[in-house]
């Protein structure tokens, strides 16, 4: 008899298990019941990742927001003065430049067969086991092995058998290169008598340097000359994502991605990392750049994104097809999910362990505190970089700015940190849908922005939509922005107008092309809006989902994160004066600043523009005048008060980041790598720290496994007992260990309280060959947006 219990890739249960308690804590008592966060002040400071453990032990900071290096995290495990929270918060990929080379040259990654061969040239197991010392899991698609949607595609991953096989990969590369006209001369690929060179940009801040070196060696062994260019964040990002791929400043880059929240039913990631239409594939949808194009992926991706499916099964099939197409194209080679370790001082309490982001999620800094202290110091690798651009329209896209901004601004909805399902945050909602097959009548007085006339226009008769969502913004509109002005429907309407006008006003779309092109496929599904009263708005949209919360998330009109007068002034600078740009690509194309409201130069530029607007009594009256309304949503007098409050804010704080969250930005000093966030204690703010604490989830465990050897020709049963929250399920694959072929798959049969069985009939076991098989198991819960995997090896014999 032979039975061995092994990890599949790695043991995901261990991957997700924090050193904190495994059940949500119910004894959290914040130090204050005032509106706002638990502490009065947050300090963000930069600490080198190599020194971070020493600085934490020395009391220089209370938590480190950048993931520790693996060796450093291991050393801290036995330190009683430090808590380690672990989560699969970071993923690694290699993005390949598939642009065709100029005449007389050859880009190997323009050849799909070479890109596909890269899947087997990368030793993911070595990366996970050696470079990350067991603190990572090999990754083959956009889905981490912890993601709920990994269950949707894990048989595809198994069938692809993308295990490290360098000899096979080199053979595939050789066949493709020879077909393209290249020759292997003294072990080096040449094309028209010149060596084929690959420019490889490798990040240096973390283990990606070692990953890059591993891949560089594999490429050299495959016959390529590799120019390794080791770069930190800002110059690497600039070269890869802000230059035309056909200029070949790069051929391959070590990407790293942070995860903000779990998502039970993904639609964004599978699009963003596979389909060009969202602007995250080489070419980045920038006008004038060479573009990676794939109409089939785009069309299918838009259908998934917009809920154009009949049921969950149809949605899953779309997802599976996109996953397979992504593997076929292999523009991105996924490498690993990193079990990132975040260090927190032992006396800090109030941590929420988001399943995807760990303590770096939305919740923790709103509720964390130290006894007898009113402040926390948060360390990060950087507080500011040259790519940290703070504008609410086309910036705040890097981890360093977004980690801070997340504390300043509240979302309308946010995914639950455990279930991964969108939930109300500051906006409640009611969903009515006729989908997937029916339609609802849109009231004739519903309106949309008409960029041609520059007005809101009623949609008229005979307009239909699949779904209607009624949003209640009371928790926003009965509260104030940081500068003391009450948030209102006018702020929501300006945000709506801005999105539509950038996308459909040809003059604006010509300037901010990427924004326009990537937003239109979503905006065109909105069929009308209706303001019901000072707090509520109806949204009519052609979108359906089997979970109503996803309909509400899709249709959300705004999170009113920035006052309308700031957006109006920014629009004036970007589109009328042409003295700034929202996006980096537009800034480069028109040689103007990529506007950042925390930089003194840029903030003063906005201040001057607002002063001019105020002096001229400028006011976007058309935006605030709804069809048939007897009065504007706001007026020139109120606008003057808004302008004055914003200008006073600049005088007091030296920047123009004004939002609605539990902290406000009190001080930001880029040269000093420092930011101070002070608690927003305005009595209108709707939450206290106690309202937002979530704690730590219970995870799924395999409590018992009974899987003996298979006797050929006899009925077989293996049983598994699970432990975890909610309704549990278990799916299995039976895999031939020699060929990696799937022999059987399905849902395990419920056999009692959290007990499941996998059964094979006499005929099924009779058809098996002698040898070793693997049961690949994936356990899920309706209360968790993650799965736990196990692999059991089983011998098949005559007795």
Task: Please annotate each region the language model reported.
Residues 24-40, 78-79, 108, 187-192, ...:
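Surface-exposed, Gly/Pro/Thr- and Asp/Glu-enriched linker/hinge segments
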Residues 30-74, 225, 478, 651, ...:
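Ligand-site clamp/hinge motif
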Residues 31, 269-272, 277, 281, ...:
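Long beta-strand-rich cores associated with HINT superfamily self-processing modules
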Residues 35-36, 68, 73-172, 190-194, ...:
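Local pocket/hinge segments that shape ligand/substrate recognition
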Residues 53-57, 61-73, 79-82, 221-280, ...:
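Periplasmic binding protein-like
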Residues 110-217, 321, 366, 374-379, ...:
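Append "and occasionally in soluble cytosolic enzymes with long acidic Gly/Pro-rich linkers
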Residues 116, 128, 227-237, 266-345, ...:
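Extracytoplasmic/peripheral linker and loop segments enriched in polar/acidic and small residues
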Residues 427-472, 579-656, 661:
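Long, low-complexity, polar/charged, intrinsically disordered or flexibly structured peripheral segments
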